Amino acid sequence: MQAFNVDKDKTLNAALFILSKIGQADYHKIFKILYFAEQQHLKNYGQPLTGDVYQAMPYGPVPSLLYDIFKASENQSSPFNEALELSKAFLVTREERIPYVTPTREPDTDELSETNIEAILNSISENQQLSFQEITEKSHDSAWAKAEKAPETEMSYLDIAESGNASPEMLKYIIINSENQTHKFY
């Protein structure tokens, strides 16, 4: 499993940046736009955008930390103090059981690199207009399918990059990069 350190500020500001471009959106749309931005960033640069851990859930990949942040905002409580603190950047309301997220502040774009912004904007362009069903089907790629069948639903960044058609050289770079970042390669 390739592990990277989660950059909490980058995760927060990536979500805020997405919302600043698309307006209020449901969890699903935000998660999938971020997932495809992560995939593109891995393919092109050998590094994830946020380092968040993606879980293979029934409707596609879900970033764990961002999910905890949104749930903390929605419930105004969390067992995770950090998620509760970061949740203040969002307002979550439900309409017909669907959770919609609205930012309560602007993103700090200094937390995002030019390549992060490029990947997010490309993902928005490619995925914003897709229906729930279309983006779900698109996100059910080989990385999702592999993790979804496993006892642990955590998706490997190497599998995510491979499903995004990263070159063999880039896949090798991702392995080395993950080893150097966390010393937790297994």
PLM segments and residue spans:
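Domain-edge interaction signal
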Residues: 1-186
